[in-house]
């Protein structure tokens, strides 16, 4: 059993394909017996993925900054709530407690979380050991959402600006994503 962080938007996109992917991922994480950790909002894709995991009988941990209104916290249907002082502390806490990470479609906050993991992997912050593998950071590329970013990262590697194993993986289907988590 792993502890898996899911990074995604607190907004609900108009496209049902992203909502469906979040719902399916939440269910699958629960079905695999993993614990889902997320940023604590009950809104948008965050709310969808956490509700799906809980409804499937999974364990869900919300890491919520104190700047969130109390009604957001009280309305959470999760296994555990961890309160932190800031968005930065939320990110640090999630990264420290998880074995693997999945990025669903999201905005700037999602990219910030994704790249925080990638940088930590490159610096071997998790292990302090260059021989120890990186924690997987999986970009769930729903309907090509991350294809432009993946192309940019490929270019950075070809140009010698991105080095070593940063743990960044991509998957275009739920099945691929779950296999990478195993």
Residue ranges and their predicted role:
Residues 1-97, 126-134, 139-182:
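A cross-family phosphate/adenosyl-ligand binding-site feature
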Residues 89-126, 138:
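Active-site/ligand-binding-proximal alpha/beta "capping" segment
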């Amino acid at each position: 059993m792993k502890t898996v962080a899911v990074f995604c938007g607190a907004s609900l996109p108009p496209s049902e394909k992203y909502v469906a992917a979040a719902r399916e991922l939440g269910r699958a994480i629960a079905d695999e017996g993993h614990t889902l950790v997320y940023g604590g909002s009950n809104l948008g894709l965050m709310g969808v993925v956490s509700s799906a995991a809980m409804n499937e009988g999974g364990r869900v941990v919300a890491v919520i900054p104190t700047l969130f209104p109390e009604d957001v916290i009280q309305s959470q249907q999760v296994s555990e709530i961890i309160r932190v002082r800031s968005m930065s502390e939320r990110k640090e806490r999630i990264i420290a407690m998880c074995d693997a990470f999945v990025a669903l479609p999201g905005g700037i906050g999602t990219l910030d979380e994704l790249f925080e993991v990638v940088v930590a992997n490159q610096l071997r912050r998790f292990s302090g050991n260059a021989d120890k593998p990186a924690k997987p950071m999986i970009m769930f590329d729903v309907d090509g959402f991350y294809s432009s970013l993946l192309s940019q990262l490929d270019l950075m590697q070809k140009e010698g600006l991105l080095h070593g194993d940063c743990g960044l993986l991509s998957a275009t289907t739920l099945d691929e994503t779950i296999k990478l988590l195993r």
